[in-house]
């Protein structure tokens, strides 16, 4: 948000790789590449750890912001983004099960599911917490968005917004 310049994350996933000297894992390198398309040069670094779970990635995030904030402001901002879902669940099993029962063809299409009570604001400028990345639904939405943008560069956002009914405010 704005000119914020530093972010840290830890991704716990089904395999590990930590080979990039500047970014750590490919996650931060990929994110840095994305932000560079918006002329933002951010200090990004990520680590990953291998766990025996096929459900979804668990990501710890830590953001240092220029402007002061509060936990409620962070929750309000996250709630206003339809690609972000909030949850009270602490287990990937519960979130994954919700997606299988309630999601479009058993998928959660939101880009991330933030564990609401894990959000912490320290010294008014540092936000941390945990989120889950719904792997299959996340990549399905990204693939749809890339294809629609290629085919309809001037109206793709309207077409993607038509999927809004399949995003969850809460899981």
What does each of the following model-derived ranges do?
Residues 1-12:
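Single conserved hydrophobic/aromatic residue that forms the stacking wall/gate
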Residues 50, 56-63:
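Glycine-rich phosphate/diphosphate-binding loops and the adjacent beta-loop-alpha structural elements
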Residues 21-25, 29, 55-56, 68, ...:
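Electropositive phosphate-/nucleotide-binding environments in soluble metabolic enzymes
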Residues 17-21, 51, 133-136:
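Hydrophobic alpha-helical scaffolding
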Residues 13-35:
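Mid-domain beta-loop-alpha active-site segment that forms a flexible
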Residues 5, 56-58, 124-125:
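A general secondary-structure signal for short beta-strands and their flanking turns/coil
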Residues 36, 40-48:
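A structural supersecondary motif
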Residues 62-171:
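C-terminal active-site/capping subdomain that shapes the small-molecule cofactor and substrate pocket
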């Amino acid at each position: 948000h704005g000119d914020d310049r530093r972010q840290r994350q830890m991704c716990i996933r089904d395999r590990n790789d930590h080979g990039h000297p500047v970014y750590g894992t490919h996650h931060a390198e990929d994110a840095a590449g994305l932000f560079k398309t918006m002329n933002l040069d951010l200090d990004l670094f990520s680590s990953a750890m291998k766990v025996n779970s096929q459900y979804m990635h668990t990501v710890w995030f830590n953001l240092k912001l220029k402007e002061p904030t509060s936990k409620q402001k962070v929750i309000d901002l996250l709630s206003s983004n339809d690609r972000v879902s909030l949850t009270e669940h602490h287990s990937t099993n519960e979130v994954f099960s919700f997606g299988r029962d309630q999601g479009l063809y058993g998928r959660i299409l939101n880009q991330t599911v933030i564990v609401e009570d894990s959000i912490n604001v320290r010294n008014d400028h540092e936000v941390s917490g945990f989120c889950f990345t719904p792997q299959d639904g996340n990549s399905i939405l990204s693939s749809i968005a890339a294809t629609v943008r290629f085919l309809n560069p001037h109206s793709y956002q309207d077409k993607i917004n038509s999927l809004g009914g399949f995003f969850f405010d809460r899981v």
